[in-house]
Regions:
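Switch/connector loops and helix/strand junctions flanking conserved nucleotide-binding motifs
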Residues: 88-94, 123-127, 199-203, 392-396, ...
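Activity-critical C-terminal alpha-helical subdomain
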Residues: 514-643
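RecA-like P-loop NTPase motor core
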Residues: 373, 378, 393-510
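Switch/communication elements of ASCE P-loop NTPase nucleotide-binding domains
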Residues: 1-48, 292-295, 299-442, 658-660, ...
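Conserved catalytic network of the ASCE P-loop NTPase/AAA+ motor domain
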Residues: 69-73, 105-108, 181-185, 316, ...
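Nucleic acid-processing catalytic cores of prokaryotic defense/repair systems
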Residues: 1-110, 117-120
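Extended helical coiled-coil dimerization/tether regions that scaffold
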Residues: 186, 198-352
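Glycine-rich phosphate-binding loops of NTPases
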Residues: 54-70, 86-231, 242, 426-427, ...
Length: 695
């Protein structure tokens, strides 16, 4: 069995939400204040016996409508549904625990627990009276005064909160059957919060956690020996205990012998103070049990070299891992029927807030794999993890990820794995598999950031943040991630973010793509080949033409590219818009003399198009450029720009040039305000994209 969903109403950041869980690991992600901790708190209210059930005024969702508060006293409801797992066979213990909770009684059973925090009915009339007074008074007062909602909340806190009651109902709420606390004892709820002192709880056998684990695994070679029946195991263990008792008595006798003469001196003071009377004298006596010996044991770390250090001197990250391993061992103890009989736990839940604390990336990945293996081995039934770590996220499958996000009236939920469906409801497996391969520790940031800018290549990835500074746009302030998808694969990502899909993450998405015009000789070519903008749609009798015509996917997914007349690639666009900007010519740029001369000629107002063509060295490609320029109907200025842009495009490599150009443009920014600064025209499609993202 597993907790399949949690329905929360009017609790903290949750106005009305249903969160569906997986049978296994649940990786709950989201930005700060998206409701992750509140979700775990809601879970604990039902399943953690140590959790307080009495809530306060600040536990109510403040996004509740004013009219709702006027009509009825606010109520917090948390409803947990438990279902049969996919590979689960219900045990007798499962059914015995769930018997009174069931709402579906067949093999695919379903059970419900509902927590309510409510104002008893007998106080509702008085509540209405107070509400009428607040509303009537509000109509007579100035509009600038405190709004009615705030007045109602203060009134509830002052006059009614003390009357609020909490109940946990089982099965159908209409039946008003309350939870038997003993049945909840069969649930093992283990919670590691984000601010945890693991050293306090595990370093010494004096601590209950380590003591319980040691006691259970004492004589484990006998307890786990399948060749021995239960009776033989008990005989063997009792033999060891008897042997320990003999040795401990010998030890105590030795202590008594050593203290014999000193004891007389110690106890003489009792006689002198009058503590001895009626011939009754103080003395020393005691027995040494195994449990008391555990308190002597200290957790240490032993290296291959034989060096031993106390665990308290160990790093916090490693101590966190040791603590988790002990906690899982304790859960194994708690679930052992032979050890605890009817007190054994039936359902074990491990809840970890920010498991990445103090762990470097590779250890985060290893931890998640360790937890998954423990779940598969059924040492824990269900695991809940909240995280900000992209490394943790990349270590789980999309099916395990639950994404919480803020909206105007609180928190909502998205399920990335459920978004990959076509218009007929069929699963688009190819896109889902592509995204799962794509989401490494860097690129999984798309699930955390508030907005995402997808780009096709390394040049855009390196240069966009520089361009944003030229435009005085702060990507950091808007929590924008720039993600290079290495090609034109935007369609795979549209499933994740298309707000028309109920399971998607509805954040603002912008895609930058190139126009990339192509043509195909009708008589010679089977495939399209790249062409220059000034060659596009020039000779429709000889060529078929095409270009990248991808359009906006939805209202929150917008696509920007170069214009239809001059557009080709980012490099082409930069040179076209900045035809005399020699900052573009970097160390790795080829054909530097030609490019410098072309830019000088452009600055010469008297230069002609032919003069620029004459600078080009003789080659097949340059002849093609000349033919294209002479055949098109562009103005002379457009032709000059096109020659420079074409020659620049053919002289740079994507990655190396982009890195050098980013450094050069950044250096230019440092000169802003002095004579060394040169103006740079940012491509309009990039300006538009950044403007949309930063709104």
């Amino acid at each position: 069995m597993y907790i399949s969903q949690l329905k929360i109403t009017n609790y903290r950041s949750f106005k009305d939400i249903t969160v569906e869980f997986n049978d296994g690991i649940n990786a709950i992600i989201g930005s700060n204040n998206s409701g992750k901790s509140n979700l775990l708190r809601a879970l604990s209210i039902i399943f953690d016996k140590k959790s307080t059930k009495k809530l306060g005024i600040d536990d109510f969702c403040k996004f509740i409508d004013e009219q709702y508060l006027i009509d009825v006293p606010p109520k917090i409801t948390i409803e947990a549904t438990i279902k049969k797992g996919d590979d689960d066979t219900a045990t007798e213990d499962d059914i015995s625990v769930l018997a009174n909770w069931l709402t579906i009684l067949d093999d695919n059973y379903e059970a419900v627990l509902t927590y309510e925090f409510f104002l008893p009915e007998k106080h509702e009339y008085t509540y209405k009276t107070f509400i009428e007074e607040i509303v009537n008074r509000g109509e007579d007062e100035d509009q600038n005064n405190e709004d009615i909602s705030n007045k109602i909340w203060k009134m509830i806190q002052k006059n009614f909160l003390r009357f609020y009651k909490h109940k946990i109902w089982v099965g159908d709420v209409k039946n008003q059957s309350t939870l038997d606390p003993e049945t909840l004892d069969r649930f093992d709820y283990q919670f590691l919060d984000a601010i945890r002192d693991v050293e306090r709880d595990m370093l010494s056998g004096k601590n209950s956690l380590l003591k319980e684990v040691i006691d259970f695994f004492m004589d484990y070679d006998i307890k786990s020996d399948s060749t021995l029946d239960k009776k033989a195991q008990n005989v063997a263990i009792n033999t060891r205990r008897d042997d320990f008792a003999i040795k401990s008595n010998d030890l105590l006798n030795d202590i008594h012998a050593r203290i014999k003469h000193g004891k007389k001196e110690i106890l003489s003071y009792a006689t002198q103070t009058g503590a001895s009377f009626n011939n009754a004298l103080p003395n020393f006596e005691g027995a040494l049990s195994e449990l008391e010996i555990y308190s002597v044991l200290q957790l240490i770390v032993e290296y291959e070299t034989g060096i031993k250090i106390p665990a308290r001197n160990n790093g916090l990250g490693y101590n966190n891992l040791i603590y988790m391993s002990l906690l899982l061992a304790k859960m194994q103890v708690n679930a052992n029927v032979e050890h605890l009989d009817s007190n054994a736990k039936v359902f074990s839940m491990l809840i970890i807030e920010e498991p990445e604390s103090h762990l470097h990336p590779s250890m985060q990945f290893k931890l998640l794999k360790f937890l998954e293996n423990n779940r598969k081995a059924k040492k824990v039934r269900q695991i809940f993890v909240t995280t900000h770590s992209t490394h943790i996220t990349s270590a789980v499958t999309l099916d395990n990820i639950i994404c919480l996000y803020e909206k105007n009236d609180g928190t909502d939920v998205a399920y990335p794995a459920k978004t990959f469906t076509d218009e007929h409801g069929n699963e688009v497996i190819s896109s889902k598999q592509y995204i799962e391969r794509f989401l490494d520790a860097v690129k999984s940031d798309i699930l955390f950031s508030d907005r995402v800018l997808f780009v096709e290549g390394i040049a855009e990835q390196l240069l966009i943040s520089i361009f944003s500074r030229y435009l005085d746009k702060s990507l950091e302030d808007y929590h924008i991630s720039i993600v290079n998808i290495g090609g034109r694969y935007f369609n795979h990502f549209f499933y994740l973010f298309n707000e028309a899909n109920e399971y998607a993450i509805p954040k603002k998405i912008v895609c930058l793509t190139d126009k990339d015009p192509v043509r195909r000789d009708k008589n010679k070519d089977r495939n399209f080949k790249t062409c220059y903008p000034y060659e596009f749609n020039i000779d429709n009798e000889t060529y078929d033409y095409d270009s990248n015509n991808v359009a906006h996917a939805s209202s929150n997914i917008l696509i920007f590219k170069q214009d239809d007349i001059h557009g080709k690639t980012l490099e082409y666009e930069l040179a076209y818009l900045n035809p005399s900007l020699k900052t573009l010519i970097t160390e790795s740029t080829k054909n530097k003399p030609e490019l410098n001369k072309l830019m000088d000629l452009y600055d010469d107002q008297e230069s002609t198009v032919q003069q620029l063509i004459d600078v080009l060295r003789g080659s097949v490609e340059n002849t093609r450029i000349e033919t294209g320029i002479n055949s098109c109907s562009l103005t002379d200025d457009e032709k000059k720009r096109s020659i420079i842009a074409t020659r620049y495009l053919n002289s740079v490599s994507k990655g190396e040039n982009a890195l050098e150009l980013a450094i050069a443009l950044q250096s230019n920014l440092f000169n802003k305000g002095n004579d060394l600064y040169v103006d740079v025209v940012i491509p309009p499609y990039i300006q538009e994209a950044l403007e949309v993202l930063c709104q």
